[in-house]
From Swiss-Prot, chain B:
Top-rank taxon: Bacteria
Residues in coiled coil: none
Designated name of the protein: ATP synthase subunit a
Molecular function, one GO term: proton-transporting ATP synthase activity, rotational mechanism
Organism per entry: Synechococcus sp. (strain RCC307)
The family this protein is said to belong to: Belongs to the ATPase A chain family.
SUPFAM superfamilies: F1F0 ATP synthase subunit A
Gene (UniProt): atpB
Length: 155, 239
């Protein structure tokens, strides 16, 4: 049945456990050929894939680190800007308050002085009118008294 | 060499011989090695067909394997030249691993061969010696191509007294590499076969699980030692 496997049974050697024969060099050649075949089919492509991935991972890691550093720098910068802006806004508010205060005081002072002067003037006028009225009354009283005297004397 | 047991026969050392010219080869080793190599290549082709940056399915497994083998090669050989040797170390590991596990998991007994039987290709001494000799060749090639003739300073370092030991080591390295793998896998297959022939149900299961464990460990040991030897050859002394 398996006679095709028996290429030549005629001069079969004795055999044995330590039967070294042409199997040895042929097996050596087979292993060497297998080395080249596996190098082409296995070691080179898989090595390339693994090393490519290692390269990809290390470059993306470096990139990510760089981006993180950039983000941190940006954050610090923005925080500083924010602090600056806050300080500025506080200063502006303070300034505005002071300005308002000053303007209010100025306006108040102006209004007060104006009111004072108007009042003074009004008082002066009142006094003058009073004086004038008094002097008019005096003259009329004198006239009346002289008229009365005249009438009495004439009677 | 037949091992006679009360319930079943266990064949050891029987081979399916193919003849090419004047040369005999073990057909069952090649048949089973083609099957496990085919399975390995099928997984690889399936997993690399559509590579994506977000891995999916089999690609995950392949990337895990690649990463594992890269770490193994890099730890033993060093950052500088491990890339040149990763395919060789990785192929040794993958081939031994799928051979060992294939030998343990595929029901080879379904197929009846005229002689011998299918099993893990690594349970044949020819396979393991072939790979161990390739490691030795790789050792010298790596040393000579990286350092030129200065590579031979390795034999007199740290002191020339080491010379005979280091020369002996060149012979013991492939010997221990090949016999460790061969012995472990064959012993595992035999233990499972013997237990299965005595008690066919349940009892062999723990031994089979242990066999899977040792199979994986043996693949790791072979690949690690091969990488370590190559690393020794290319190692730069800090003078």
């Amino acid at each position: 049945m398996h006679s095709w496997l028996l290429l030549a049974e005629a001069a079969t050697p004795k055999g044995g456990l330590f039967d070294l024969d042409a199997t040895l060099p042929l097996m050596a050649v087979q292993v060497v050929v297998l080395t080249f075949v596996l190098n082409a089919l296995f070691f080179r492509p898989v090595g390339k894939a693994v090393e490519d991935r290692e390269g990809y991972i290390s470059t993306s890691r470096a990139q990510a680190k760089e981006k993180l550093a950039q983000a941190e720098r940006l954050e610090a910068e923005l925080k500083a800007q924010l602090l600056d802006a806050r300080k500025q806004s506080v200063a502006v508010i303070q300034q505005a308050e002071e300005e308002v205060d000053r303007l209010f005081r100025e306006a108040l002072a102006v209004a007060q002085s104006e009111a004072n002067s108007v009042r003074e003037k009004a008082r002066g006028e009142v006094d003058a009118e009073k004086a004038k009225a008094f002097s008019g009354i005096d003259a009329q009283a004198e006239k009346l008294s002289s008229l009365i005297v005249d009438r009495l004397l004439a009677a | 060499m037949l091992l006679h047991l009360p319930l079943a026969e266990l064949e050891v050392g029987h081979h399916l011989y193919w003849q090419i010219g004047n040369l005999n080869i073990h057909g069952q080793v090649f048949l089973s090695s083609w099957i496990v190599i085919g399975a390995l290549l099928a997984v690889v082709v399936l997993g690399t067909r559509k590579m994506e940056r977000d891995p999916r399915g089999v690609q995950n497994l392949l990337e895990f394997l690649w990463d594992y083998l890269r770490d193994l090669a890099r730890d033993q050989i060093g950052e500088k030249v491990y890339r040149d040797w990763l395919p060789f170390i990785g192929t040794l590991f993958l081939f031994i691993f799928v051979s060992n596990w294939g030998g343990a998991l595929i029901p080879w007994r379904i197929v009846h061969l005229p002689s011998g039987e299918l099993g893990a290709p690594t349970a044949d001494i020819n396979t393991t010696v072939a790979m161990a000799l390739l490691v030795s060749l790789a050792f010298f090639y790596a040393g000579l191509s990286n350092k030129g003739l200065k590579f031979f300073e390795y034999y007199v370092e740290p002191t020339p007294i080491m010379l005979p030991f280091k020369i002996i080591e060149e012979f013991t390295k492939p010997l221990s590499l090949s016999f460790r793998l061969f012995g472990n896998i064959l012993a595992d297959e035999l233990a499972v076969a013997v237990l299965a022939s005595l008690v066919p149900l349940l009892v062999p299961l723990p031994v089979m699980l242990l066999g899977l464990f040792t199979s994986a460990i043996q693949a790791l040991i072979f690949a690690t030692l091969a990488a370590f030897y190559i690393g020794e050859a290319v190692h730069e002394e800090a003078h």
